[in-house]
Amino acid sequence: MTPDMPRLTLYEAPIEGSITMDGSEKIIIDVGSPIGTPRTLEGYIDLSPMESGDTIIIRQYVKLRPDEDYRRHAEETYTGEQPLSLLYINPRPVKYGVRITAQQVTGTYKTLKYQFYIKRV
């Protein structure tokens, strides 16, 4: 590849679905990289079902070594109706693994939709 050639962005098939809250910490996505191949994860979680009285915690974990456990990288709490209801998970470099979870701690349990993309680096 010469310096003036553009780099191709290769996305794997999107990972999408929905998950129903039940009070426990639920795994939305858990992506390991085979043989430590670097990748980037980004995506969306739809918080539009949230209403007054609801509290949902979104946590992000990263694995730094293949033989280690995940370590919490970030945690955000969302309460009540969300005026910006589509939560964007910023691109996260992944070598050995990344996990995104949700836990609803108050309110009537909701079902959250999600869509994530994995990009080969």
Which residues fall in each region the model found?
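Tryptophan-centered short beta-strand motifs
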Residues: E25-K26, D67-R72
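Solvent-exposed serine/threonine-rich low-complexity stretches and specific carbohydrate-binding patches
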Residues: R71-E81
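Noncatalytic modules at the cell exterior or secretory-pathway interfaces
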Residues: T37-I45, N90-L112
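Beta-strand elements of well-folded, non-transmembrane domains
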Residues: L47-P49, V62-L64, R120
